[in-house]
Amino acid sequence: MDPSSGGGGGGGGGGSSSSSDSAPDCWDQTDMEAPGPGPCGGGGSGSGSMAAVAEAQRENLSAAFSRQLNVNAKPFVPNVHAAEFVPSFLRGPAQPPLSPAGAAGGDHGAGSGAGGPSEPVESSQDQSCEGSNSTVSMELSEPVVENGETEMSPEESWEHKEEISEAEPGGGSSGDGRPPEESTQEMMEEEEEIPKPKSAVAPPGAPKKEHVNVVFIGHVDAGKSTIGGQIMYLTGMVDKRTLEKYEREAKEKNRETWYLSWALDTNQEERDKGKTVEVGRAYFETEKKHFTILDAPGHKSFVPNMIGGASQADLAVLVISARKGEFETGFEKGGQTREHAMLAKTAGVKHLIVLINKMDDPTVNWSNERYEECKEKLVPFLKKVGFNPKKDIHFMPCSGLTGANLKEQSDFCPWYIGLPFIPYLDNLPNFNRSVDGPIRLPIVDKYKDMGTVVLGKLESGSICKGQQLVMMPNKHNVEVLGILSDDVETDSVAPGENLKIRLKGIEEEEILPGFILCDLNNLCHSGRTFDAQIVIIEHKSIICPGYNAVLHIHTCIEEVEITALICLVDKKSGEKSKTRPRFVKQDQVCIARLRTAGTICLETFKDFPQMGRFTLRDEGKTIAIGKVLKLVPEKD
């Protein structure tokens, strides 16, 4: 019998496979030790001794598996150099020397039990001389547990899945199909390369860096995901090998220039079409700050997703394509450049970096004239939206595909004298966030995972493990069981961080995006009716009382009706009209009463700007932006 296939069956199958292919080494040894009669037995005593043998076999197997079985183990890779090593669970109390089959089985046990083919085995081998058998088994099991708990485990398991599919097209035993040294070498490379991002995500004992959410916005195909992927590579969050793998896959699909964006577009559909749909998330670090990239979709069908991303952002990066024709398409009416910039301002983004991308394109060739032309067209519009060109906006040229001017000064644009993109981000002044303010965490998403887990950005206040909170507007009392900040477990968090919080006392079905986690003693306001100042951005016809639209406020999306128009506001002087208007039209500002279909959480803009500014959308267009002035109590 082939020992490698037998070992594979024993390591993976547990008790489900037949006697012919389940851990043959243990069965042989037990048979050798059993003093019972021949195969055909001798009446009652024969059956008794066979029962005893079966019992001993069962105990042996269950003891072995209960101690060492690891469902997350890496795929079995034979290691020819470790044949002499036998783990403690295969040595019986007083056992004769093992047969070659047993040694092969032992070799397999080492490979699968340790979770890695060579390095963990060698370390435990050194220590087996000093300690007892139990020490060895501890040494074997510990790396597995650590591996399971690291924050990088999603990426690791994904890498291994890839490896299994490549190495074992026709079942488990094909591990012998190529030289074991080669596969072992590959696995060792894997071990060395994966932990790199780990230290970047959670440096132990280091002072906590300020956390900043950056949303990449702009027209479809301006290069947002490519720049995001390039930043991930330049800051060491994606290794060269992974990037080369994306490049190979992109070439196979004739999408050669898209490979960088695949670091953020993880969904297969997004990769095939080259369009971001969801808001992609990724992390990178500079010397002073920890950044989360929110890569917003640029296509107009996905603007609601983009609003969700912008509502969590501290800083927006507007990506513009300098390529002839592309800039004009994105900026003219119908393009997303205008709408995205406006929505970012409405969502509360104070600082805007405008990256003029694709400067390496043959139609541009790092032309200063083209750069200035794009800048001249953008400034008046951004000023109109509400950004201050001197304080809030910073322009810079770059190439997402080559990485020019992202981390280091580029020789291609000697005319640009500012800092490159990543150093500029690192030197931004700190954001003022209220640690002492009331707890406000708007829910972005929720899912089940050993309880109910909610996702969101903590806007103000601080949360710690074991704290009692309230989920508004339903007034559900909940307890915080665990907190993950950017997938790293922590006991307490400050404002501005992206969190996953495990809650007790509420079911996942009882939560909707737009709900707010609050302090017991300081609940947020909730209701259906409020007065607001709104600016009509784009609407062909007039808007009268009774008009319906979709309200986007913080992470909440709800249907809303304008029930009454109270007065018009003069744009320049701010004076309010004495009479009630019968309608409003494009470019006018008015104060109106709005009523939502369901109860929502909101605050006045004056008290809490993040929960007091909103957008009205209709038929796929942004109709108006506004701010909440007054909450109107419900009539019973």
From Swiss-Prot:
Extent of Gly residues compositional bias: 1-16, 103-116
Region G4, annotated ranges: 357-360
Keywords, comma-separated and alphabetical: GTP-binding, Hydrolase, Nonsense-mediated mRNA decay, Nucleotide-binding, Protein biosynthesis
Biased composition range(s): Polar residues: 121-138
Keyword Hydrolase attached: yes
Disordered: region residues: 1-54, 90-206
Transmembrane region(s): none
UniProt region (G5), positions on chain: 399-401
Coiled coil: none
Residue ranges, compositional bias (Acidic residues): 183-193
A single Gene Ontology CC term: cytosolic ribosome
Source organism superkingdom: Eukaryota
Record EC number: 3.6.5.-
Region span, G1: 218-225
Annotated ranges, domain tr-type G: 209-435
Region of interest: G3: 295-298
Reaction catalyzed: GTP + H2O = GDP + phosphate + H(+)
Entry keyword Lyase: no
Region (G2), start-end ranges: 274-278
GO BP terms: nuclear-transcribed mRNA catabolic process, nonsense-mediated decay; regulation of translational termination; translational termination
A Pfam family hit: PAM2
Chain's role: GTPase component of the eRF1-eRF3-GTP ternary complex, a ternary complex that mediates translation termination in response to the termination codons UAA, UAG and UGA. GSPT1/ERF3A mediates ETF1/ERF1 delivery to stop codons: The eRF1-eRF3-GTP complex binds to a stop codon in the ribosomal A-site. GTP hydrolysis by GSPT1/ERF3A induces a conformational change that leads to its dissociation, permitting ETF1/ERF1 to accommodate fully in the A-site.
Family: Belongs to the TRAFAC class translation factor GTPase superfamily. Classic translation factor GTPase family. ERF3 subfamily.
Subunit structure: Component of the eRF1-eRF3-GTP ternary complex, composed of ETF1/ERF1 and ERF3 (GSPT1/ERF3A or GSPT2/ERF3B) and GTP. Component of the transient SURF (SMG1-UPF1-eRF1-eRF3) complex. The ETF1-GSPT1 complex interacts with JMJD4. Interacts with PABPC1. Interacts with SHFL.
The protein's name in its UniProt record: Eukaryotic peptide chain release factor GTP-binding subunit ERF3A
